[in-house]
Amino acid sequence: MKPRTFILAAAAAVCSGPLLAGSGTWTSEGPYGGIVYRLYVSPAAPGTLYAGTRGGIFRSNDGGVSWVRKEAGLSGSLGVAGISLAIDAEAANTLWLVDGVGRVNRSSDGGDNWALTGYSRPAYDVNQIVDAPGGTGRLYLVTETSGVLVSNDSGASFTASGSGLPAGVPLAHLAIDAANPLRMLAGTRGYDATDPLHTESIYLSTDGGASWTGTLGSASYYMGVTDISFGAGGKVYAAVDDALYRSDDGGASWTGPLLGPPYNNSIMAVRADPATPNTVFIGGYKGLARSTDGGVSSTPLTTGLIVTAGMPASVNRIVMHPNYPAAAQLWLGTEEAGIYFSASAGASWTARSDGLAATNIRALAMFHDAATHRMFAGYGDAFRPSPALFRGNNAGPGTPFSSWAPSNTNLGAYQIRSITIDPTTRSGGIGSTRLYATGRAGPYPDLDARDGGIYRSLDGGGTWTTIDVGLPVSGNPPAANVGTVRNLVLDPRSCAAPPPSGPCASGPLQTLYATSNGKHDGATGTDSFRVLKSGNGGDSWLSSDTGIPQPIDAATPQRQSVLVVPIVINPLNPQELYVGTSANYDATALAAPTIQSGVFRSTDGGANWVFRSNGLPRRAGSSHTALDVLSLAINPANPLELWCSVVDLSVGGAASGGIYHTVDGGANWSSASNGISATDIRALLVDPSQPNVLYASGAGSDANPGSVYKSSNGGATWHSISIGLPADAATALQVDPVDPSVLYAGSTSGVWSITQLPDSDADGVPDAVEQAAPNGGDGNADGIADALQPGVGSLTSASADGNAQPATLQPYFTVSITPLAGQCSQAMDVQSVYAAYHGRDVSSYGDDYVYPRQLARFEIQDCQSAKVKLKFHGASFGSGFGMRYFGPAIPGDPATLGWHDFSVRANRIAADTWELTLDNGQFGSYRPASANAILFEGGPARSEGIFRDGFD
């Protein structure tokens, strides 16, 4: 995932000294690591590595010690695109990538710049892109629907590779023998049911893909092939259905499955020793092993790979130094734990993920006292071993987190979904502070890493204990299991001796509530433990979900059930709690759901729950099933006031939803989405020091970016504060407990922070920046200061080096909006974007467009149509200039992202001023019409090619 913007370059025009981290714009903070899909070492420069990750595309120039994002010119769900990344072995600066909408991209400068080749496939059709060794410009696509495709023009076009591959069978992996590039092996993606027509899993070609023959089959279906590696002496190794297979004749026939416990049924990656035929490295769910007898037996190589609960990182990529084994260096890509390096042929490992921002952070909490300022960040949605919980330290509010480390000693979790600090235990410092974390442990078959998903630390996160006594058990051997535990709250008056009123000052607190998937009883068709309660600080738990609807028609396709997600507690009367639920049902079997779902309230400490959802939007055709409630927030000063977010998850892309508000304890709800353009709100947060200040984060995509929103009036109106934020926004929010101007967000690329600067008109440009604009801060010369006009924003242009520059070096531009239809009175996130960040904009003459003043980006709230003037102070645009737009040609469609001519909707009305006509849901806006907002990015540009005929 790439950041949506490059820089807000105006802050230094009015500030002296170094800027605080995230001042006025979102800044990446770490922690680092995460899912690695592809990993390559440059054959020409072994210190250069490339990684395709869930967080995007990264390069290292120092052997993996540090990593830098390399995405200039890329767009289209790059976290997905990391699956399809390749390097040209003969031209090591040439890379290819298939983005999330199926477009082939190429870089010829080591990833510094990317451009489309012009070829595309359907979204998610490409599982792998493979360079053909022995020549430049030849590569292959491994597809879901069309077998193996081959290109001889560096990705500009592809054709079918040859005959013999089964029609309609998805392929997942292709390996080419570097010693004989005509010999190739293709593996299928896997099938989980009987398919007697297609039982072969690996296909061999000895003529460069002109023809194929099946060489490895099963009794009744094709299996899943995740890796194939050619070795010395005709040996080939393959990971097939999580098992190891070996061929002694170059893939013509196979032996297997090989190996016994613990590596059977756990293998994802193989890498043959290029010099020793019987030696192979084996990676998978149990870490890394090496076999020296052709896969008959193996030895674990997990020193340094243990990440949590005694479990090693799951290895899905094994990369060797080009001169291995003379240079005994190896790198590993893992499922959830980033990249590891060994200088000793795997004898020991060290993490090498600094800068690799691909951690999926779903939970945040902060501790502060005079000696310690610490952030806890939980890794979400992991089903393989991950660090699970990180702790970071900084020098104080707004300063960068200079160090992150796992905080998971004895923590039996693979993922963390909530972190809660007991405030009554803070007085003794971090070392005696009690923390709770919830999430999920290892799934089956990781029998040695299963527990109930609730954890407690008595020493500030230094060590952890699982606290799941009383939870239902399953499995063999039995272990506590209630699925994912998503949220946990504390009763603030549940200490041993509570005061007459108000929260306890000393603790620890004893009454805890949590929400989880719960336990389904197949015999009775009932669910329990969706709400959990403990009265002894987590030492034991009881089910507390009476009144939460039981499944309907539990044994039929018409089954309906509810999942309990958020929970909040009334701090003034802790007997009162609220939960939000999400409905599960088969839309193909039911015309409309009938189960009660939405918000429920308990007034007796969770003993009973009552439906409390009047006014929340319902599923189509339903009277009782509200849209999915994914977050809740309560006003600590007035607990009758709550907010919730609802999303229609039954529709792909969460096409409808928003924020709702109640002032009577949930008896009635009304929409509170004024200013919210995102429909998929995943987090709500009330600033505890200013309960009228709220934050919300909305998910999105590159072509319809998500945002973080702020309301200063209790949710009556919202505005975006999203400059620099990743396109898919955030799933966790945290206000700094010392300085509420500092806000943190958890995303799929780690933690991001922003230090909010005064911005009276909420247009995204700090007041001090607008006050320094031309004409004494009146950039549009209308007699009113720009800093006081929500529809006017003035700031300096972006700089090439990414550093803020004074106005003497980077002159100002001004955005001013005139409504045509709709209110169109509020500009948001007005910013400058460095044009080259989007890659080359190539004219019809083959040369690049030049952007002397870079790009202007802004969003207009509550708007159907508007005129926008862009005044670039001091500029003089000749007749050779036109207006260019970067964004989707079809609003919201990532497949149409790119550079476009916008001159038909733009007029130059003065030497330095352009006037744009913009319409909601039309060309020139990222947003689809349903957003009722216009998001534009573009600027004046000139192609030198227009002068070639001798005319201006």
Q: Where are these predicted regions, by residue range?
A:
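Residue-level signature of beta-propeller blades and closely related beta-rich strand-turn architectures
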Residues: 55, 101, 145, 190-191, ...
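Short coil-to-beta transitions that initiate beta-strands within beta-rich domains
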Residues: 28-42, 71-88, 118-132, 164-177, ...
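Extracellular calcium-associated, cysteine-rich motifs in secreted modular proteins
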Residues: 755-808, 944-952
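Blade-level signature of beta-propeller repeat domains, shared across WD40, Kelch, NHL, RCC1
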Residues: 728-758
